[in-house]
UniProtKB/Swiss-Prot annotation:
It comes from Escherichia coli (strain K12). It comes from the Bacteria. Part of the ABC transporter complex ThiBPQ involved in thiamine import. Probably responsible for the translocation of the substrate across the membrane. Transport is inhibited by the sulfhydryl-specific modifier N-ethylmaleimide. It is found in: Cell inner membrane. GO terms for cellular component: ATP-binding cassette (ABC) transporter complex, substrate-binding subunit-containing; membrane; plasma membrane. InterPro entries: MetI-like, MetI-like_sf, ThiP_ABC_transpt. Coiled coil: none annotated. This is Thiamine transport system permease protein ThiP. The chain crosses the membrane at residues 12-32, 58-78, 95-115, 134-154, 199-219, 240-260, 293-313, 334-354, 374-394, 404-424, 463-483, 506-526. It is a multi-pass membrane protein. Keywords: Cell inner membrane, Cell membrane, Membrane, Repeat, Transmembrane, Transmembrane helix, Transport. The complex is composed of two ATP-binding proteins (ThiQ), two transmembrane proteins (ThiP) and a solute-binding protein (ThiB). The gene is thiP.
Amino acid sequence: MATRRQPLIPGWLIPGVSATTLVVAVALAAFLALWWNAPQDDWVAVWQDSYLWHVVRFSFWQAFLSALLSVIPAIFLARALYRRRFPGRLALLRLCAMTLILPVLVAVFGILSVYGRQGWLATLCQSLGLEWTFSPYGLQGILLAHVFFNLPMASRLLLQALENIPGEQRQLAAQLGMRSWHFFRFVEWPWLRRQIPPVAALIFMLCFASFATVLSLGGGPQATTIELAIYQALSYDYDPARAAMLALLQMVCCLGLVLLSQRLSKAIAPGTTLLQGWRDPDDRLHSRICDTVLIVLALLLLLPPLLAVIVDGVNRQLPEVLAQPVLWQALWTSLRIALAAGVLCVVLTMMLLWSSRELRARQKMLAGQVLEMSGMLILAMPGIVLATGFFLLLNNTIGLPQSADGIVIFTNALMAIPYALKVLENPMRDITARYSMLCQSLGIEGWSRLKVVELRALKRPLAQALAFACVLSIGDFGVVALFGNDDFRTLPFYLYQQIGSYRSQDGAVTALILLLLCFLLFTVIEKLPGRNVKTD
């Protein structure tokens, strides 16, 4: 009896292998382009370049300070948010989650409107007869912006750790009379200390690879990071060899940070409890006052820049700016790039998770982890590094395109894969545990299973991943900074041009439109599954 020929690669493995091959091939092509353009015989002079080492030191120093100033206050803010229930708490938690995907230039514009020399606080001090001496440029401005972005995210992640503490532990501590420092040390700290290192490593990595923030608020050669030096080498000096060398250095640093972050990131098992969310009824006055002060300070950090964008955007230039065709051209460019990049990101992520899930089901854990890690690999090549590789590759072959839609879409999709993986990874595993045996018994597999099971059960996580990817793409400035021109510009690129030419009122309108577009796009995509889908 003739036996049926077995395929070289099982069908369930093809999606993951294809996505992994694509991601690795792109990363390898960018790396080779950087390597070929890097100065091969001038490395000794490079290592002796004092300015280069100043840039490297500043990159690490500002990232370290940003992580420190974000994580330490987040510990106390997370405790306050856990203990207090107040109107608007859910909205505040949602805002904490949104700051990570808020367009950087919008936040920078709001920060300048509040803390700048002509900002709200300067005007208030002037009316009180005081002198406003704070400058939002340089290291202090970079730290302020990074804390604005990362303190809410750190608070949200640490709050999850506090919510995992079994209610029985809290109840027992209350019965034993544990209060304040002793309660923090023996009950909360064992859970927080497992979450703090990976959170700090993540924030350090994000701040180390920060580009738009440093470009806008750097304030000169003394406050320059490696990514900004890459941009300057290509855009101002046009020194591809130096840009390639800096990009390789940045890639090595980021790869080390990614590996460190992955090593520190250990899943925290939720506590088994029958008293979820139990809180000590013995609530002291000074504790309530301290928590209220912390929450008010957090609101004063987050809300004024966002309110400034809205208030400053509604100015007398609004009708004139809205009548400019270039604004709507930039909006349409941003929208089509964001939607295309979001869809491509979700498709590639599902391909990786599909094959990874099948490998894990067959007890091939290491192979499954390798597939998932290939999606995280792109974190080792920040957008500006990947864009530099594409820039040099195209410049040395077919030439730079007039319109870089495809490059920007593809790069933004790759940069969003790690975030989409985090959104879809656990729901995908839950579905496997729930429906895998049923699908096997019914013979449902492949495309049929995807259509009947995954696409139905994953409606909400898929919409959330798509929303995150689209908003991350629409607010990106790092990639388009190299390829943008008068014929190809997105809203962030157009806003940067307005800020650079001191058209602050026009820029305020553009920042408001970009903020509203991100909010509407995120809300609409998140609502796509419909009201009947259960939400957290």
